[in-house]
């Protein structure tokens, strides 16, 4: 795997003292554009993706194995994305679809 596509383990994040406190869960449905900043292991075969939206918000989103990780597992950091968030029948906001629109220079 390309180092630019690395998925950090929880131990690596702790050892490197990576602070993710600025990131919040997405709270609205809609289409957004942003940049992939980092990826980390989650729980129960998931990964967490860290995004900066074009409006400046910092978002954390869990992606699950049954979503085939939406292509994020091997996606390079810095990838510009169009993100489509939806609401489940349980009123949970989730990332339904993603489109690559470019690579940050």
How would you describe each model-predicted region?
Residues 1-2:
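N-terminal intrinsically disordered, low-complexity, charge/repeat-rich segments that act as generic
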Residues 5-45:
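Structural detector for short beta-strands of small beta-barrel domains
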Residues 39-42, 53, 86-88:
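Acidic surface patches and DE-rich sequence motifs
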Residues 48-55:
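Short, acidic/hydrophobic/Gly-rich beta-strand patch recurrent on exposed beta strands
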Residues 57-75:
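Beta-strand/loop nucleic-acid-binding surfaces
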Residues 86-105:
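OB-fold/S1-family single-stranded nucleic acid-binding modules
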């Amino acid at each position: 795997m390309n180092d630019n596509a690395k998925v950090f383990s929880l131990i690596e994040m702790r050892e490197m003292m990576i602070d993710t406190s600025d990131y919040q869960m997405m709270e609205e449905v809609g289409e957004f554009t942003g940049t992939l900043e980092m990826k980390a292991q989650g729980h129960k075969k998931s990964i967490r993706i860290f995004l900066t939206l074009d409006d400046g918000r910092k978002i954390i989103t869990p992606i699950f194995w049954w979503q085939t990780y939406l292509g994020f597992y091997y996606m390079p950091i810095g990838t510009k994305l169009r993100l489509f968030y939806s609401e489940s029948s349980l009123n949970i906001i989730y990332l339904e679809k993603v489109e690559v629109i470019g690579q940050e220079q």
